[in-house]
């Protein structure tokens, strides 16, 4: 399949085709339909299986699936207890949702490069990008949502007045340094969603690109490279989901604290 695409448009055409989203609309209102579909679908998969595990929870001996879900829940709960120092019942469910959702989106990278795009082509879709976290719109959508939660809880917990004073008089308390504090804190706040979104996007985009490059090689070379990279990539997709979750917890913990 990679050879056919290579012959049709060259290596560059093959790479561009796999990294081009299925879009609808123009300009600012362009929607990446494939990103929206796979994001919502994977979110629904997470909700379905975790709800099923919760409904099947019993006081007796749990099954393998329930053990697996409980292990993930306990792992996330431990991270929240270690990193979040406020009191908020939303943080643990939010952290669990972020970890599982981001992991599932990242895990789409482990599917054969041409599998779903060829299925899409068979039903008339010119483009189909199947890894939502390789779309900057998706990663920034999540990181900006976290940013809004940071602002919301900063205002709710500290109050507008205290939040403004903290913004203007931290880290330097002298009134003459208010402009410097304002600039410093603005950059610090804006850097959180930017770094959160770019980190996830950059790592997953690079991983997907390597899989695509491997698919361009002769078929007899591909297994020797794709299998080791896939095994290593399992660590990457898990680590990126973990980092996104932990940083979200830390940022929200800071929003609950006063300087």
Swiss-Prot record:
Function: Key component of the proton channel; it plays a direct role in the translocation of protons across the membrane.
Topology of this chain in the membrane: Multi-pass membrane protein
InterPro entries: ATP_syn_F0_a_bact/chloroplast (IPR045082), ATP_synth_F0_asu (IPR000568), ATP_synth_F0_asu_AS (IPR023011), F0_ATP_A_sf (IPR035908)
Pfam families the record matches: ATP-synt_A (PF00119)
Entry protein name: ATP synthase subunit a 1
GO cellular component: plasma membrane; proton-transporting ATP synthase complex
Gene: atpB1
Sequence intervals crossing the membrane: 30-50, 90-110, 135-155, 209-229, 230-250
CDD domains named in the record: ATP-synt_Fo_a_6
Keywords associated with the record: ATP synthesis, Cell inner membrane, Cell membrane, CF(0), Hydrogen ion transport, Ion transport, Membrane, Transmembrane, Transmembrane helix, Transport
Family the entry assigns: Belongs to the ATPase A chain family.
């Amino acid at each position: 399949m990679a050879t056919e695409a290579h012959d049709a448009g060259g290596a560059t055409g093959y790479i561009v085709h796999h990294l081009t989203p299925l879009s609808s609309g123009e300009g600012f209102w362009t929607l990446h339909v494939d990103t929206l579909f796979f994001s919502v679908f994977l979110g629904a998969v997470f909700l379905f299986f975790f709800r099923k595990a919760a409904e099947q929870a019993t006081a007796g001996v749990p099954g393998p699936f329930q053990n697996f879900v409980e292990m993930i829940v306990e792992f996330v709960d431990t991270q929240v207890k270690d990193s979040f120092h406020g009191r908020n019942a939303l943080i643990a469910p939010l952290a669990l949702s972020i970890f599982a959702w981001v992991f599932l989106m990242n895990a789409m990278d482990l599917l054969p490069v041409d599998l779903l795009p060829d299925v899409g082509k068979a039903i008339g879709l010119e483009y189909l990008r199947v890894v939502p976290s390789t779309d900057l719109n998706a990663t920034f959508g999540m990181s900006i949502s976290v940013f809004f939660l940071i602002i919301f809880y900063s205002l709710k917990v500290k109050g507008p007045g205290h939040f403004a004073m903290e913004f203007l008089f931290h880290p330097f308390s002298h009134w003459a340094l208010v402009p410097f504090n304002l600039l410093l804190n603005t950059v610090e706040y804006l850097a959180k969603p930017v770094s959160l979104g770019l980190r996830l996007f950059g790592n997953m985009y690079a991983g997907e690109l390597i899989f695509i490059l491997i698919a361009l090689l002769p078929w007899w070379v591909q297994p020797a490279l794709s299998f080791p990279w896939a095994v290593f990539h399992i660590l990457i997709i898990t680590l990126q989901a973990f980092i996104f979750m932990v940083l979200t917890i830390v940022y929200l913990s800071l929003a609950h604290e006063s300087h």
